[in-house]
Amino acid sequence: MESTIQPLDRVFLHLGPITIYWYGVIIGTGVLIGLWLATREAVRRGLPKETFVDLVLFAVPIAIVCARAYYVLFEWHYYSKHLSEIPKVWQGGLAIHGGLIGAVATGAVFARARGLSFWKLADIAAPSIILGQAIGRWGNFMNQEAHGGPVSRQFLENLHLPDWIINQMYIDGRYWHPTFLYESLWNLVGFFLLLWLRRVNLRRGELFLSYLIWYSVGRFWIEGMRTDSLMLAGSLRAAQVVSVTLIVLSIALWIVRRAKGWAKARYQDE
């Protein structure tokens, strides 16, 4: 039966000489849904409705460039010999941590230029970011990437997955852990957790720090299953190192901001 399994078509649409891939469509959908949610919350929090539209116009291109640069840097042994492939982001190869660095840096500059609180913007954006990540992982699914080690078909059937997911995990003659799905579900739970924490009315900035902690815990765990991790040295996985660093820094910043009185404003404060 395996010999007849065909992967899902990676192409969403052909427009003459232009090919649009599912990878880009799915990531774009995540961005648009996240933008809609952030804009609604921004208006509720007393910000102009165009605030996040303006921010996204800067943050998304910069995040994509940073995500690609991060990935290419760790895979330079390959891309140094295939320079023409560096711009081909539709083939995959966007590192979330690189994109996050670019987006946060852009957000900080944007907030300063607009005279806004960075932490207020970050808190509003946090649920949108993690939901966008949950959606975006399905782009990896369509590209048959970001998977874990080999498993049996029976293992996947025991997870009660539909055949279209099981069949898509059949790559190079073997079935593989659907780690894209694990991370997508982890992030989806994180999205609802952040919505609940938003009602708790934490100190300003702590919702974003909660996002960093939650995402990093899940990423550390799931990254250990993957077979395509970006490596620092030997068996040291870059994403796991970054995840631990983010957890430690987020907790430390949470404690220091409260101890120093830097986090007096609440999420719901104007």
Curated annotation (Swiss-Prot):
The chain crosses the membrane at residues 18-38, 55-75, 90-110, 115-135, 177-197, 205-225, 236-256. GO terms for biological process: lipoprotein biosynthetic process. Its EC number is 2.5.1.145. It comes from the Bacteria. GO terms for molecular function: phosphatidylglycerol-prolipoprotein diacylglyceryl transferase activity. One of its GO terms (cellular component) is plasma membrane. A 1,2-diacyl-sn-glycero-3-phospho-(1'-sn-glycerol) binds at residue 137. InterPro entries: Lgt. It is found in: Cell membrane. Pfam families: LGT. It is an enzyme of class 2 (transferase). Pathway: Protein modification; lipoprotein biosynthesis (diacylglyceryl transfer). Its main location: membrane. Keywords: Cell membrane, Membrane, Transferase, Transmembrane, Transmembrane helix. It is a multi-pass membrane protein. Belongs to the Lgt family. Catalyzes the transfer of the diacylglyceryl group from phosphatidylglycerol to the sulfhydryl group of the N-terminal cysteine of a prolipoprotein, the first step in the formation of mature lipoproteins. PANTHER family: PHOSPHATIDYLGLYCEROL--PROLIPOPROTEIN DIACYLGLYCERYL TRANSFERASE (PTHR30589:SF0), PROLIPOPROTEIN DIACYLGLYCERYL TRANSFERASE (PTHR30589). This is Phosphatidylglycerol--prolipoprotein diacylglyceryl transferase. The gene is lgt.
